[in-house]
Amino acid sequence: MKTKRTFLAISIPCSTEFPAMVERLKKNLQHEHYINYVKTNQIHLTLKFAGETLEEDVPAIIEACQKVAKRHQPFVLDFDRTGLFGSNRVPRVLWLGMANPPQALFDLEEDLLDAFDELGYLRDRQNFVPHLTVCRIKQLVDKQFFLQIYNSIEQKTYLHADVKELVYFQSFLQPTGPFYKVLKKIPLGQ
């Protein structure tokens, strides 16, 4: 049986503020060779990572997502704060999130997880933390300097997104980083 590595997300268009912030990080942390930055043209907020998905299940997943999307209206997201996954001792991911994510996002995510559960793609045990990955950290040469740079990031709105659709992606892992192919765009409220 053939599979595809898939996930459902909200694709986030880049403003000028976000790439500028990433470039400042790269410049300030240029001596850190084990940090992989997400390409700014691939920024997305993952709602459900399905992982290895049977090709024969893809049409049913798309149909289920379309049914859910019809019940939800477009909404707005403002990404205005940064955070770390891992810990200050061992940071693993630097992310951009929201101080006050809208309830509409959580309602949509919950309905989508229910739909995926019904198809046998069960939810993760982790709580949903809506975020955009800025970079993944394999190892730090100078952890204190990294934390100093991280703590100096201005907390302001870096991205504003009018969410009008979901995107079902296929992910290809490559040595240079992941590549995403759009399988289906699914409008909200239609």
Regions found by a protein language model. Give the residues of each.
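Histidine-dependent nucleotide/RNA phosphoesterase domain, centered on the 2H-phosphoesterase fold
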Residues: M1-Q190
